[in-house]
Amino acid sequence: MTTTTCESNSIYPVRWQDNKVWLIDQTRLPMEYGEVEITSSEAMARAIETMIVRGAPAIGVAAAYGMVLGAQEITTDQKEQFLADLTRIADRLAQTRPTAVNLFWAIERMLKVARESGPEVAVITKNLLETAQNIQKEDVETCRAIGNHGLLALPEQPEKLTILTHCNTGSLATAGYGTALGVIRSAWTAGRLIQVYADETRPRLQGAKLTAWECLREGIPVTVITDSMAAHCMQQKLIDAVIVGADRIAANGDTANKIGTYSLAVVAKAHNLPFYVAAPLSTVDFSLKDGTGIPIEQRDRAEIYQVGTTTLCPRDVNFYNPAFDVTPAALITAIITEKGAVTPAELIFLQDS
């Protein structure tokens, strides 16, 4: 049996045990905590599409394990056919969420390992599992480094900060610890945080459901606000800084993140508040010179008009439901990575680091 070990007091949304994957079902939080057993690559693809697992780094890890499950499904012992079958599995996983670049990064890393392995299919599968586990372990280490660098990047005054964040960027969105919420955790541990303001993050409410849940688990004071209250809170001087995550960052620093992020950046600029993006370098797509080339996922209209079984508004109207928006680099104070905090203009220098 090969098991992914976890610290007992931490949240790990993806767990490998007994040749299968267990995912925390994030669609059931915060009312119910439970795991979903994933035994096939197709089941993993559906779990990513339906956001049982979500967050750019987390779906990268999940996709890597989905590749392992797919490798276990392949029956041929010929490497050439194995690679052809594995590529089809990779293509299916890549179709699940088009914006988050970590997904494609992890899939390509897995395919590279398969191509460069020897001719024995059993050895290739073993190498794929080891690679998926390494991706998971590396992401936890990366998030902790982001937290440390982010702590140093925060404004020196006031000594104790109130930080606004958007969506969920914590342990649930990564392999563990978190990106933007990882910085917040580090600030809390260092005694530099008074409280967190969490946007509810319409339409799927990841801030209200998931960020608030994670903060409560760790004893971090958290206040949930509707998305439309953020500007008012800044105007009333309730916010000292804004920290968000990212799903894809272009080479110039333009950042795609959960819908509503751009609005926050605009109002933060208007109120002279620092606006930080926290993300691993695997989220940076250096092949894109700016954010105009970032694909924006369009999701089901029902996410807007319905919560659970409750209909919120007339269905017989048009709905527009982009999952992400792009914040221009000019609105971003710094991008916090595992290599340090840099301005958007300096990001390109981290490409080969």
Curated annotation (Swiss-Prot):
- Name the UniProt key words of this record, in alphabetical order: Amino-acid biosynthesis, Isomerase, Methionine biosynthesis
List residue numbers at the site (Transition state stabilizer). 167
Q: Which residues form the active site?
A: 247 (proton donor)
Superkingdom of the source species: Bacteria
Disulphide bond pairs: none
List its EC numbers. Answer: 5.3.1.23
The Gene Ontology biological process terms listed for this entry are: L-methionine salvage from methylthioadenosine
What molecular functions are annotated in GO for this chain? S-methyl-5-thioribose-1-phosphate isomerase activity
Task: Specify the enzyme's EC class, one word.
Answer: isomerase
Residues folding into a coiled coil are none
Q: Which pathway is this protein engaged in?
A: Amino-acid biosynthesis; L-methionine biosynthesis via salvage pathway; L-methionine from S-methyl-5-thio-alpha-D-ribose 1-phosphate: step 1/6
Q: Reaction catalysed?
A: 5-(methylsulfanyl)-alpha-D-ribose 1-phosphate = 5-(methylsulfanyl)-D-ribulose 1-phosphate
Gene3D superfamilies in the record: translation initiation factor eif-2b, domain 1, Translation initiation factor eif-2b, domain 2
Record-annotated residues binding substrate? 54-56, 97, 206, 257-258
**PANTHER family assigned:** METHYLTHIORIBOSE-1-PHOSPHATE ISOMERASE (PTHR43475:SF1)
Which family does the record claim for this protein? Answer: Belongs to the eIF-2B alpha/beta/delta subunits family. MtnA subfamily.
Q: What does this protein do?
A: Catalyzes the interconversion of methylthioribose-1-phosphate (MTR-1-P) into methylthioribulose-1-phosphate (MTRu-1-P).
Q: What is this protein called?
A: Methylthioribose-1-phosphate isomerase
Organism of origin: Microcystis aeruginosa (strain NIES-843 / IAM M-2473)
- Name the encoding gene, please: mtnA
